[in-house]
Amino acid sequence: MAQQINISKYTAEVKRNLGMAVSDEIIEKDLLLTLILAEFERLGLGKELIFKGGTLLSRNYLKYHRFSEDLDFVHRDSNELRELSRSLREKRIKRFVDCFAPELSKVAASLGLKFSEDRSDTKFCSILHGRVVYTFRIYYSENQYIKIEINFVEKMIHKPKEVSVKAITDFFDSKELMFTLGLKIENFKVLSYTLDEIILEKYRAILTRNELKERDLFDLFLIKGSLEANVKQIAEKIKDSSLIKRDLRKMIADKLTLLKKNEFFKSDERIEDLAIVKYNIKDFEEFKKKITPILADVCERFLRE
């Protein structure tokens, strides 16, 4: 990295101050996310983006309840882009990516990471779903990377708000540590999803992922009032993802069947590997029971429309 950091001291101090028993690798990856966001701020890369996803939720809304591994964005004109003809939309997206990829290369170079602007190299870039979702990968080792995803057609229901994205060192008195390490981090200021939008997105993710990720349920479990979410808006959110997801009706019908059979919550993911906050396992299991009829209601509403 351009900033030569005593990683072992950093990880030890973070774990000591926050009382965490997680692997050093997870904390190191979290630091990389922070440094990448700081470079985004330095280069002004947030002007056309809206921040969303688990990293935003953890850092700015739930006081680092769990570690997140990716950086997820929506283009700020996505509501407009989704209404354009495919050819016009692709031209607009290409124009943005042609400018963004070289800047992302600068971010990687400044941190001693590996990235290629060659969009035909699928190791570094995947173009998904009719060229409306771009996934970039910045490698910090041979096979390990930070994923940066930009969705160009996400429909936003709530107006985004500007935030300063927090780092884990904002949650304890880290001045001495930062000075000792010579570590200077400028928080990334960017338009971001509101908590209401994140709740809708989490419900949508729970019902439209091919495989259930327990982290989505855990996030809703910790968000106060998430069980009072607007069912109609959740169904709309699912419907609006048709530009990205294929066979939505079959997918939702299958999820409804699993809910009715009490087979919906099977997941290979272990939330305890990512969770920072202490939580009551019985309460989490009870939450799954409470959210089941809400998820079924969303499915039924979607299938009726």
Indicate residue ranges for each PLM-predicted region.
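Glycine-rich beta-strand-to-loop/alpha-helix junction loops that act as flexible
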Residues: 51-55
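Structured mid-to-C-terminal alpha-helical surface segments
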Residues: 1-49, 59-65, 75-305
